[in-house]
Amino acid sequence: MKSSQTLVYSIPRNVEKDTCAAAIKAYQYLISPPPSPIPNDKVASTVDVPKCSTIPESPKDSIVEPKPTATPVAQLHSKVYDLYRDSPKIWLRRERQWLQRHSPAYRFSTPAAKRPRRQPSSFLDVHASNTRKRGSPDTPDSGHSTPHSKGDVHPGMPQHNTRFKQSSREFSSNTQAIDVANTPYELLPDYSPDMSVLDKRSHPRPLRSEWKGPPLDLSNDENRHLLHPAELQLAATLRLPCLVYLDNKRRIFAEWHNRRTQGLSFRKTDAQRASRVDVNKASRLWKAFHDEGFFDD
């Protein structure tokens, strides 16, 4: 068997110190490469030495840009609203023509012109227009029926009868009542009581009422002679001129007479609807007349 030989370098003792240093330097070349002959300060400037790292850097995500294509890409843009905004009437006419052509069930008819409303010339015309009799519940009412064309009826839609039954009390009220709120003062019948009965009252101040603010001065009113002194005090307290007071008094008692003939009670809200003043002042008038018993049967 061959014995392994070990290479041993021995330095003689009689070698000088400089020789020993040179031998040690030569010995280092056996275990490491020789140093570069270029100085270290010049190596960085002349040679691009790659830096080593124990942790490899992660690759950066590269953004891939789409390559431009030579063929153009088709794009769709809506122009319906722009066309409608430029000419809405023409667009509507075209849509109607399309509906008439594809859907014959839809027919667009022009509305008939309304006849001008005839103004009442006298109290008899007003009374006749308000007391026009309606059809009975068993017979159709020709005055309130609305004609329908065949084009207005859509296929598949149920037909409903819009005629309603009417109670006997409502029928009697419609044939006898007068629209007090919309009737001129001169055409209203005067159902006001005789105010001379106020002189026989035991209390010194009949037709009492309260209102905020100072009373209205009616000393120079040209219609003050038509009012009782108690009525003058009531009108001044409510700050109503004499003519306004007379107008609302006649309307209140006309409405009271209409409801009494129908067998109905006369409430404060009924006086408010018939009057042409503030609802609070109408309530004060109703209370003043009610306290004196003018609404008693």
Swiss-Prot record:
Region (Disordered): 50-70, 109-173
Domain of life according to the entry: Eukaryota
GO molecular function: chromatin binding; DNA binding; transcription coactivator activity
GO cellular component, one term: Rpd3L complex
InterPro entries the UniProt entry points to: Homeodomain-like_sf, SWIRM, WH-like_DNA-bd_sf
SWIRM domain location: 207-297
Gene Ontology biological process terms in this record: chromatin remodeling; regulation of transcription by RNA polymerase II; transcription initiation-coupled chromatin remodeling
Comp. bias intervals (Polar residues): 159-173
Keyword Transcription regulation: yes
Cellular localisation: Nucleus
Keywords: Chromatin regulator, Nucleus, Repressor, Transcription, Transcription regulation
PROSITE patterns: SWIRM (PS50934)
A Pfam entry, by short name: SWIRM
Protein purpose: Component of the RPD3C(L) histone deacetylase complex (HDAC) responsible for the deacetylation of lysine residues on the N-terminal part of the core histones (H2A, H2B, H3 and H4). Histone deacetylation gives a tag for epigenetic repression and plays an important role in transcriptional regulation, cell cycle progression and developmental events.
Protein name as catalogued: SWIRM domain-containing protein laf1
Record lineage: Eukaryota, Fungi, Dikarya, Ascomycota, Taphrinomycotina
Gene that encodes the chain: laf1
